[in-house]
C-alpha cells in the first residue's frame, strides 16, 4: 500500500505486520499477523478478544491511532476501562485525569516489547515469504521475548 505522510511524501509498504498485546510487565499475551496495509485499529478488537480469553485485566491502554467510539464501547463491553489517547480530529485534545495519565504512561512497556522483538529477536529481518512462514518466524521471536521477560521477572 501507499499513503502520503505528514510532509506530503509518499510512503509505501508491503508484507505483513505483527500486532502484539502485552501485559504491564512486557510479557506478550496475544499476537495477530495482518497485511501491512491494514490499519492498526482494525486489529484491536480481535486482539482484545484473544487477550480477554487468556488473562483478566482492568485497563486497555492504546495510543491515538486507536481512538474510535466503537473501540471505546468494545472495551467497556468487556468490563475494561479504555485508556486511549485522544486523537483531536478538528478539535481540542482531551487530557487524561492525573491518575489515568500515570497509568497511560505504562504504555511504554508495550513499545519497549515491540522494539526488543525487532532489535533482539529477529522481527526486523524476516527473510521468508508467505503468511504461515512469516508467522512461524515471528512466533519464535515472541516465544524468546516471553521467556526473556519471565526470566527478568524472576530476578
Positions of PLM-derived features:
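Charge-patterned, long linear interaction tracts outside catalytic cores
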Residues: 129-155
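Polybasic low-complexity intrinsically disordered regions
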Residues: 1-77
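Catalytic-loop motifs flanking and including active-site residues across diverse enzymes
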Residues: 43, 109, 113, 139, ...
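Helix-centered, glycine/charged polyanion-binding patches within enzymatic domains
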Residues: 59, 64-132
